[in-house]
Amino acid sequence: MAAAESDLVIGPDYAPAPETRVAAGVPVGAVTAFTLYSGDSKFYPGIARIENAITRRRDPYGNRIAAAAHEQSMPLPYTRTVWVYVPRQYERGSAAPFLVAQDGYGYMKVLPRVLDNLVAQKRIPALVAVFVDSGGGDAQGSERGLEYDTVSGRYSDFIEAEVLPRVVAETGVTLTSDPNGRATMGASSGAAAAFTMAWFHPERYGKVLSYSGTFVNQQSPPDPATPRGAWEYHDHLIAQAAKKPIRIWMAVGEKDLHFDDPEETWHNWPLANARMAAALKAKGYDYRYVLAKGAGHVDPRVTEATLPGALEWLWRGYR
């Protein structure tokens, strides 16, 4: 793919894509919901950040400073909701391609509508979508931070072992095992989690969709193997590893989080995402990088303007 097709600049004016609106006569997919309990999880029994002098520490630019797990977190049970969208066109017994969305509730308003329209227009296959909420909180010391910002295969293992079997049991769908038919997406730390799912298990996921990805130093608790968390991806992990069969679409706002912070903070979102794109390009990945002029962090204007096209781009050529 030519560089001109891979690196795009959009904005600063945005309008919702027509596929984000309800269209007359379009079949509407069914949505089922169920609850997961931390007490049943082998992967995530539940934590929450302790609010104390240690967790209130910040660097000169306002970024949290990570600490050891026992200093910043305490056990706390949680419940999480999972929603499953099944398109009307799904044929029972067939192995369905699917998409896992992190911070699932945040996509429940727009994504099913987009899928209804794109599937009806045959621009994407009849996707099942799995919307998974986090275990709660945000950033260092929290359950969400542990799940999404950790640079390991743990979260992917959790989805594979504890979420997808329940999806099958609750809905009766059959899910494909073909990584080309399995996508994962998210925004902010949820986007970092999506990439991490594919990076550590490309045999499971071959497609990633990222908005304002947290490819920065936010891993908590710290891991000596990746001391700067997801910043390590574009610093050296992508360059040093054999190319993996992953296709990624990613967008970041020009005025995203900490856009004017210096590099040495390892916490500048636009810089981190630009570096991700450069690392992917250098390694020959199939990627698309979108810089959204005038946009902020996980800017809803950008999501509504680009989501249909992003999904179509990710799923092009799938049979």
Give the residues covered by each predicted segment.
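Non-catalytic cap/lid and distal C-terminal segments of serine-dependent acyl enzymes
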Residues: 1-319
